[in-house]
């Protein structure tokens, strides 16, 4: 029995990721999310960065817009432009999409709570384009899972004006932690980002890899979750304002999200 168990473990470790994905009964890939509905924008005002309930997309303190169906620049023929501006330095705009659970944009409500608890692997795959990338303080790409009373937020932040480095989010201490990995997206060009994360069998967050324009970095960072009463899987995209809150736009395309 021990020899059989060891063989199974070794086989599992040696299987390619693609095989593990496609053989999972929970495997699902959602493509071109940038074209789809369900995105909600929220202003996060400095210095607390809590959600501003009174802020408007057309306000002066911070303003934002999201415009789908852009043919140029585009990779697929239909990108979505995200713009941020305003007057309050270091303020941010967060766009959130509920994938599974209440308010699901995909119609996957999981009211029986049988899907979300069985998901352990997630891939955020997106192309992004900027004409003045240097105006961005940072770009943030998050994968979020809420299950079993625990909150798993795999936050990834590419600091640009903020220092050209990747940070990851510490759920327990609610702070960003530098990885030492450079983040230098190319201006006036399409950048391809792939983020891979996992929830371990012991309910820890595992930050696996970041791949930007074909350059892969293995993170292998494990952290503890926080607590919550939510039940969902969501993703975020966020643009951070710089010290003058200079306006800038980022186009997203081929935003694919895979889970299993």
PLM feature segments, named:
Residues 40-90:
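Extracellular glycan-recognition surfaces and repeat-rich motifs
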Residues 193, 250-257:
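Extracellular beta-strand elements of beta-rich domains used
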């Amino acid at each position: 029995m021990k020899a059989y168990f060891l063989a199974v473990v070794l086989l599992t470790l040696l299987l390619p990721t693609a095989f593990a994905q496609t053989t999972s009964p929970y495997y699902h890939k959602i493509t071109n999310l940038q074209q789809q509905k369900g995105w909600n924008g929220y202003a996060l005002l400095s210095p607390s960065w809590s959600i501003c309930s009174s802020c408007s997309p057309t306000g002066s303190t911070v303003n934002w817009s999201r415009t789908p169906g852009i043919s140029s620049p585009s990779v697929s023929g239909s990108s979505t432009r995200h713009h941020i501006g305003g007057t309050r330095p270091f303020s941010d705009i967060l766009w959130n999409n509920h994938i599974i659970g209440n308010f699901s944009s995909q119609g996957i409500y999981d009211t029986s709570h049988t899907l979300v608890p069985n998901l352990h692997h997630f891939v955020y795959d997106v192309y992004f384009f900027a004409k003045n990338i240097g105006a961005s303080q940072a770009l943030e790409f998050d994968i979020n899972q809420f299950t079993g009373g625990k909150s798993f937020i795999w936050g990834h932040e590419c600091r640009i004006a903020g220092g050209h480095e990747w940070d990851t989010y510490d759920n327990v201490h609610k702070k960003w932690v530098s990885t030492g990995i450079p983040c230098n997206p190319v201006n006036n060009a399409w950048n391809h980002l792939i983020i891979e994360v996992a929830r371990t069998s012991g309910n820890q967050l595992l930050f696996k890899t970041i791949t930007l324009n074909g350059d892969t970095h293995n993170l292998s960072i494990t952290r503890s979750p926080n607590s919550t009463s939510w039940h969902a899987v969501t993703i975020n995209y966020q643009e951070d304002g710089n010290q003058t809150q200079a306006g800038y736009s980022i186009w997203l395309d081929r935003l694919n999200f895979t889970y299993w």
